[in-house]
Amino acid sequence: MKKITFILLLIASVFAGNYQEIRINDTSKEVIHRLQDLGVDLDHVQQKKGEFIQFAIPENIASLLSEDGIEFIVIHDDLESFYASRLYNISSRNFDYGSMGGYYTHDEVVEHLVELSEDYPNVVSELQFLGESYEGRPIYAVKLSDNPNIDEDEPEVLYTGLHHAREPMSYMNLFYYMYWLVENYGSDTEATALLNNREMWFIPMVNPDGLVYNEGINSNGGGMQRKNHRETCSSNDDQYDWDGIDLNRNYSYQWAFDNDGSSPDPCSQTYRGTTPFSEPETQIVKNFVESHDFPIVLNYHSYGNLLIHPLGYIAGLLPPEPDLSVFREFGNEMTEYNNYLMGTGIETVGYTVNGEACDWMYGVHDIYAYTPEIGTWDDGFW
């Protein structure tokens, strides 16, 4: 199948107080554990084993690193400004970008879903309301198929985007793919075969509240809210980050397995919540998945040019055979042309996660679930 890549030319890292991008020339396990103990989000780390790690960090947390004796070099002192300047250049190009530095705002996401449904009713279903987010915003799904409003006996696949609010590349990629499918239906052999023989479901915006918060931070893009927007962090001294639950640590499979793969700290970027599925957003995904028969799911994130598969909650643990061979075979096919690094979290980004969506989908429902992390290290989140 043709691999559709959506390259938006984006950027590298974060915002809160001020976000910086720093490099630490020490990759030892001791340093990694010290960073985790200080609440550093290591989800997206550029690294060269044995030489350095490079990542985004709030300025106030960087101060804690200094106090702890961890030496680092500042690569970008103000990432929000860095992002905004690059996104401004992108948004001036002659392309159907959104108004948020080239990305769609929350309202534009909904508008484009409505547009797809109304303009291509022969292959795009009516919007399906799945439920409301913590702050009461609707979360929608849409199906692309040759009989979109009929439940046919065809294989289903699910694509999700924006579990993390600072990763809008995830839903932009899905919209690009949806538009490619509908615009080429009837003229392109592969697009036509897919829509004639599959039921392709899309939930492009799992975390609408976080996205709206980022719009408020910077309407031109670059906001670094990651989590949803539940009030969790009672600290007002700017020692940590924002309120919210990390939705991709809130699923039930191996939830709270340890404090490295997720955090019990309500102010942490990887805060897992008080219980599994405590959040309406993850409950919505759970209910939707359990009402369908998905053999495969792709939960889109950014960044890293990676394709990650379970299991992720403990280092070195692989799915049993024959599942491992299936994960590897599908993964190799999906990365044949884009050259993404494929494997488990440890094999790709070098960290563990627990309470994560793909682990839950595979561990509980035997779904071959993958996390495409799209965009290069230089692209970053925005």
Residue ranges and their predicted role:
Residues N25-K29, F55-E59, Y103-D107, P168-F175, ...:
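Soluble non-cytosolic domains of exported or imported proteins
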Residues E215-W382:
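Metallocarboxypeptidase
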Residues D41-G50:
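RNA-recognition motif
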Residues K3-S13:
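Sec-dependent N-terminal signal peptides
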Residues V31-H33, L65, D151, P168, ...:
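Short, solvent-exposed loop/turn elements at domain surfaces
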Residues N25-T27, I57, Q128-E132, K143-D146, ...:
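Active-site-proximal beta-strand/loop segments in catalytic clefts of secreted hydrolases
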Residues A56-E231, V285:
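Active-site-adjacent structural elements in enzyme catalytic domains
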Residues G17-D26:
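Short glycine-/aliphatic-rich beta-strand segments at the starts of folded cytosolic domains
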